[in-house]
């Protein structure tokens, strides 16, 4: 998923929306980001020990990046989309 796609799909959502990522059968909270090895894409880091990052925190950290930046999971797989849970948190897949 490109950064611009995420912005377009979430433009009417609350900026307090929490971010989660699903890998296989587990759903963990997105707690940090880091650059991928190519230094242009972003990896979403998940952890269940701390508070989940919100949509506003993610956009604040990524605001200087190009719109074509790709979002990746921790195992460097591209994120293809997301769905909402029953509390309207974003779960990336």
Label every PLM stretch briefly.
Residues 1-18, 23-24:
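Long, hydrophobic N-terminal alpha-helical segment
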Residues 20-93:
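Detector for the mature cores of small, proteolytically processed
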């Amino acid at each position: 998923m490109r950064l611009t796609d995420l912005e377009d799909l979430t433009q009417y959502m609350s900026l307090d929306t929490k971010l989660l990522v699903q890998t296989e059968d587990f759903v963990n909270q997105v707690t940090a980001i880091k650059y991928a090895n190519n230094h242009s894409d972003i990896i979403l880091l998940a952890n269940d020990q701390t508070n989940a990052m919100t949509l506003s925190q993610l956009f604040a950290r990524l605001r200087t990046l190009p719109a074509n930046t790709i979002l990746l999971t921790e195992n460097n797989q591209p994120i293809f989309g997301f769905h909402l849970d029953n509390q309207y948190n974003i779960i990336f897949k």
